Amino acid sequence: MNFPYRNIVVLTGAGISAESGIQTFRAQDGLWENHRIEDVATPEGFARDPDLVQDFYNQRRKKLQDPNIEPNAAHLALGRLEAELDGQVTIVTQNIDNLHERGGNKNIIHMHGELLKSRCSVSNQVIEETGDILTGDLCHCCQMPSQMRPHVVWFGEMPLRMGEIYSALETADLFISIGTSGVVYPAAGFVHDAKMHGAHTIEINLEPSAIESEFVEKRYGKASVEVPKLVEELLAHLESNVESA
């Protein structure tokens, strides 16, 4: 690695939150908490059975607020990295939980939305939401009050804040991917974009992802083990540069 790094972009996926007890989508059988993805994570599913979809996310929201669900060592290490690095750390997450915020990160882009927010289905106005969203809960910001929905990007919808993400990738000198499958685009293409702009690239995963060949450096194991080790290395080199200055 070419230390020190000043502009770090970290992409995180379900693997980083799984160790905190957040249930992940099982791609091998297309189920999420025993529901078909097309039933609970598509606009068509919401139109077909809004009660089912609202209940599904209401249950996920309750689970996220369970006192037993806490940031793990990987989240805490990334929070420390942002706080102590002499530069910029941007977290781009595919996760809809708030574990990065609770782990200490502030510069976070939720490209797939946030579970603890709801959104007007017409105006797209977003509000904080810690309780249940029910069919019939309306947003009154529109001339015709409209149904509230989870602030979550469903399959077939455009991810959020893509312009900001690509701007961060253009200036990144280090790109780290943690706990991602490498099969969901556009996120799976971020490593290529970062490399095109000269960034060093690192994959941290339980096993090689579908795009592992794109990465210069690979570290396989639990995120809660590998991420703190990497952060220690990054900050140690930062300190050694300060001492030698």
From Swiss-Prot:
Principal location: cytoplasm
Entry note: cofactor: Binds 1 zinc ion per subunit.
Cellular compartment(s): Cytoplasm
GO MF, any single term: protein-malonyllysine demalonylase activity
InterPro entries on file: DHS-like_NAD/FAD-binding_dom (IPR029035), NAD-dep_sirtuin_deacylases (IPR050134), Sirtuin (IPR003000), Sirtuin_cat_small_dom_sf (IPR026591), Sirtuin_class_III (IPR027546), Ssirtuin_cat_dom (IPR026590)
CDD domains: SIRT5_Af1_CobB
Active-site residues, Swiss-Prot/TrEMBL: 112
Catalytic activity: N(6)-acetyl-L-lysyl-[protein] + NAD(+) + H2O = 2''-O-acetyl-ADP-D-ribose + nicotinamide + L-lysyl-[protein]; N(6)-succinyl-L-lysyl-[protein] + NAD(+) + H2O = 2''-O-succinyl-ADP-D-ribose + nicotinamide + L-lysyl-[protein]
Record has Metal-binding as a keyword: yes
EC number of the protein: 2.3.1.286
Keywords: Cytoplasm, Metal-binding, NAD, Transferase, Zinc
Requisite cofactors: Zn(2+)
A GO CC term attached to the entry: cytoplasm
Deacetylase sirtuin-type domain sequence ranges: 1-237
Sites where the protein binds Zn(2+): 120, 139
Ligand binding (substrate): 57, 60
PANTHER family in the record: NAD-DEPENDENT PROTEIN DEACYLASE (PTHR11085:SF4), NAD-DEPENDENT PROTEIN DEACYLASE SIRTUIN-5, MITOCHONDRIAL-RELATED (PTHR11085)
Function: NAD-dependent lysine deacetylase and desuccinylase that specifically removes acetyl and succinyl groups on target proteins. Modulates the activities of several proteins which are inactive in their acylated form.
Domain notes: 2 residues (Tyr-57 and Arg-60) present in a large hydrophobic pocket are probably involved in substrate specificity. They are important for desuccinylation activity, but dispensable for deacetylation activity.
Family: Belongs to the sirtuin family. Class III subfamily.
Name of this chain's protein: NAD-dependent protein deacylase
Protein source organism: Vibrio vulnificus (strain CMCP6)
Gene behind this protein: cobB
